């Protein structure tokens, strides 16, 4: 008994001494938080960096007090201010938070993950201030890793400047669909617009000047005029450019003009000396011409954007407003655009329980551009042998490209409006309810004008030769009289096409959130419930106005015969389309945390759509996601894991239900107008798709593992994601016996899988008061494979380069090629057939069996992408160098080989290596140029050259490394501005899309991606 009593007393002594030691190790930290102008800041979050349960906020006077361990570090954070970490002190602390507006850091973001759907394509979804904007197929997601990402995002969103964007977040895993539904299957780019923080009163002016360089032929696979004329002379010697052949084509170039001028007579002389010497002089001039169409059609101009913004904030209300204009005189000479925009982001808190918010975003733009002849396309498809001041034949009518740009153009007017209002009710720290409503409107009217002098209008009157009259489809010829002389249907004027597009979207979001902690903060629980609703209405259409005399007050002189020409040719002169998309979703989320280390998240979203009409069989689509997290940093043993400074991991699994490619849960009946060659008009109905009661939504199951860690006090930080996606019940062709008149209906018959790795790494190489060097590296790898497919694509589908093909056992968007053997002694291409035989023109493009002989060339989608950015700072100077890379994709080179060529065609550098004489087949794989005699001797020779275009030698890799951006910035020291009314002046000079460091030589100089102008951008930001 005595022993037990002694042990109890000893235990009490130990407990008391331990408690005393603990109390001795904690201190009461007190202080005050101010802004950069010395004003107190209320509601600043003050948190212990290690023990997050120790947390408080500043009062109305900016004061705080918190009991923490003696060696703790406190984190001070407030929206609109820079987050600050400060070691605790026993003395009263005075903390100053600087405005966060002055720094903009790029984020290391990987590209979007590949979706698992055979037929449906998903694109990144823009979400602005929590409201869905649209999917965007044109935005290059590789730009998200750029340090200049905000400027590129602003260029993609109407009415926003770079300064209007406060931050953006990229969501690529299954949580994207849990938040925004199946429309977010392609990933989400969530943009948050700027708003004023507390204690801010700032006026800012920003100007951005962009100088775009004129394109160069070094980036295009186009022969110069000397090499082009070498090909044309060989065609002439082979009998392919004779006058009787060239003059009656729909289009001609240098040879056609020479032959045409040789028979034109004026002022007692012919336009062209039709002698050998005269033709030689004419062709020699064309050979030396080397027209630079880029310089003819493009210009050196400066696009400038001006933005003024005003931000002000108090404890009760704050607002951010900006007004800006973008003036663009045009990269091409025919282009110009002016845009004006306004933004307002305001919040008001009249009571501690209630918060009201409103956002207004409006923009209006006017633009002028080329019409049927795009400047960049025309410059890259018009031969360099052509005289830019001369008229040539195009669709039986004369054409001068420079003059056509003046007579054939497009005018656009567009308006974009977004109104958003929100209300939040927070009666306690545990409960919060909010309601958000948004209305978005977009309207655009485009006028495509072809004046009476344009080539397009002159085609309606081209009938100066009998062969032209017989072949010109712009003339009217009665269907019941084969001997009738064609008639002009638009004898006067030109014509105009007016297109209009408008969309209206209404969104309503309701949320209720409950947050609580239990057992002294050991357990934390957050419950979220809500509903989303949107109503989207889209209207579009166009109509043609014929016989408009633009030079005499747009007088209308249409001919009634024109409507007969339209009707009998089964043509339309107007069309209208209306789309209604309605969706409602109910969602719930539960988050649980134990000791701030272990977490569980679960979410469920159930949404319905009107896409399937009255059918209820597949109206509702579920999406769910669960995740487990572990913050190893908070573990007691973590300090022993040196040099690790942070470590956390998360494992998630979820299923996303997505809309199928078709919506025929019930049969779909559509209207149509049967073609009648007479005046009878009899609308009809037809069965577009048979009913498929087994149709269900596509399912994507995703497993994702995330690992975040830091080394040596975050000098090195990394994030790693591994994911696996399984696509099931995918919609594709399901063959049947022709029941109901459909042999190839669509059904849930396919499946595929996708896997990937995403890595971002940031290293603080050098950190000092005067100099710092930071490196950010991003890498992503995405691969996929079709695991089940019922359809049987033929050869033409597999070798097509338009969108790639789906084939079981191979990646989606695959390209296959016909195996090339060698050239024959005549220079004709030869190929391997399915049975191993050598064929010239006997490859069956319609075959659906025995396809294993086709060579797998690769996929159109890159498998490996990323970027490398190095940022340097010395005093007030900053330098950034960004390199972008992409590997793993291929492309089919342009189909420019044929048994017949024309004098207006643009050819690539491959033709310099063409077969010219017997024996060349041993040194080159570029076929010869057939003569007219060879075409007569081998009637199927055209099939051989067509096959060559789809052979493996016409495949190039799209791997590239590009120096994307170099930027140099300078901030004028605040000490130098102390005696002025200015608070900050920031300058930045940037060069974008500089040059390729590496690309495949088979591209012959052409870019492996869509062309973007080389730009030099100067940005000046002045704050008051």
Placement of each model-derived feature along the sequence:
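A beta-strand signature from Gram-negative outer-membrane beta-barrel systems
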Residues: 95, 106, 153, 162-204, ...
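Extracellular/periplasmic, surface-exposed regions of secreted and cell-surface proteins
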Residues: 339, 345-356, 360-364, 399-450, ...
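Residues embedded in well-ordered regular secondary structure
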Residues: 118-125, 134-159, 197-334, 372, ...
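Short, acidic Ser/Thr/Gly-rich low-complexity loop/linker segments typical of extracellular
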Residues: 52-63
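Outer-membrane beta-barrel transmembrane strand signature
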Residues: 265-311, 318-322, 390-426, 487-492, ...
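Conserved small-residue
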Residues: 204-282, 747, 764-860, 900-901, ...
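Extracytoplasmic gating/loop element in the C-terminal half of outer-membrane beta-barrel translocons
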Residues: 456-458, 466-476, 886-981, 985
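Extracytoplasmic beta-strand/coil segments of soluble accessory domains associated
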Residues: 101-136, 140, 167, 177-197
